[in-house]
Amino acid sequence: MLELFFEYIFPLIIIALKVVAITIPLILCVAYLTYAERRVIGLMQLRRGPNVVGPFGLLQPIADAVKLLFKEPIIPTNSDKILFILAPMITFILSLIGWAVIPFAKGVVLADINVGVLYILAISSLSVYGIIIAGWASNSKYAFLGAIRSSAQMISYEMSMGLVIITVLLTNGTLNLSGIIEAQRTMPWWIDLMLLPMGVVFFISVLAETNRLPFDLPEAESELVAGYNVEYSSMGFALFFLGEYANMILVSAMTTTFFLGGYLPPFNISWLDCIPGFFWFVFKVGFLLFCFLWIRATLPRYRYDQLMRLGWKVFLPLTLFWVVLVSSVLVYTDNLPSI
């Protein structure tokens, strides 16, 4: 009996504990990211931001969560009730399961699979379904138009993201995210320099992928009231909100892994190796999240035609050209990694 327990049940308990150990801190980070956003935007606009609930307003996210929890969930009369309820759950769950393959430090990863990049791409492409279902099930023209915009926007920029990731795979020679980080430890400086423009393109693309300013067309308040989540209240609205911010943290972690060395120190200095890799990972992700907030506070929203033109006529040809350029340079210099 004990053999069966240790062979079958004990590994499942360990996996469940790992999932809880990742999920609970992530939800707390998402809650306090909303607080950080309001504080940063407030400071940039020369005002205080939330500062009433608790010291320095630190309990504001908890107050918001309690408020949304006790609000009445209103379901529109002519909506598809089952899909209407499922849509925010799909969005939130997909934003969490992408973290399964992200390495927080050396050896600290829930599932260190050999196709981690494909897993991340699959999860990011599935996330559009929650938004489409929400727009269609709401039986509202504003929600439906926001959902159509979102699906077109996400599909447009996924093409560029995929080509950017191909350049990363060409230089690192692996689909394993831990392997990508370790390959950057010994990567020549000129390859890092070649990947720099692709890092910028990738970050701009994930801004569009997560529907953040200046690409928040699916929820443009001045045109669509609130976009695909206009009919949602209570925990349905909260789950969409949490899903959006969890996706922000996830794409920041992806950018950190692909272009900033993940948990590696930023410079090859011996005494920096004494600092735990988890600290460097959190620091880099925090910096990218600050860039998200900074961009929201400073840039105006793009027009829809400008958004599509940037995706299809600028980023797609540029990334395609860069894939050819990087592969040609790697073959010419005999630096193409063996797979």
Curated annotation (Swiss-Prot):
It comes from Rickettsia conorii (strain ATCC VR-613 / Malish 7). Keywords: Cell inner membrane, Cell membrane, Membrane, NAD, Quinone, Translocase, Transmembrane, Transmembrane helix, Ubiquinone. It catalyses: a quinone + NADH + 5 H(+)(in) = a quinol + NAD(+) + 4 H(+)(out). InterPro entries: NADH_UbQ_OxRdtase_su1/FPO (IPR001694), NADH_UbQ_OxRdtase_su1_CS (IPR018086). One of its GO terms (molecular function) is quinone binding. It comes from the Bacteria. NCBIfam families: PRK06076.1-2, PRK06076.1-6. NDH-1 is composed of 14 different subunits. Subunits NuoA, H, J, K, L, M, N constitute the membrane sector of the complex. Pfam families: NADHdh (PF00146). GO terms for cellular component: plasma membrane. Belongs to the complex I subunit 1 family. Its EC number is 7.1.1.-. It is found in: Cell inner membrane. NDH-1 shuttles electrons from NADH, via FMN and iron-sulfur (Fe-S) centers, to quinones in the respiratory chain. The immediate electron acceptor for the enzyme in this species is believed to be ubiquinone. Couples the redox reaction to proton translocation (for every two electrons transferred, four hydrogen ions are translocated across the cytoplasmic membrane), and thus conserves the redox energy in a proton gradient. This subunit may bind ubiquinone. The chain crosses the membrane at residues 9-29, 50-70, 82-102, 115-135, 161-181, 187-207, 235-255, 275-295, 311-331. Its main location: membrane. This is NADH-quinone oxidoreductase subunit H.
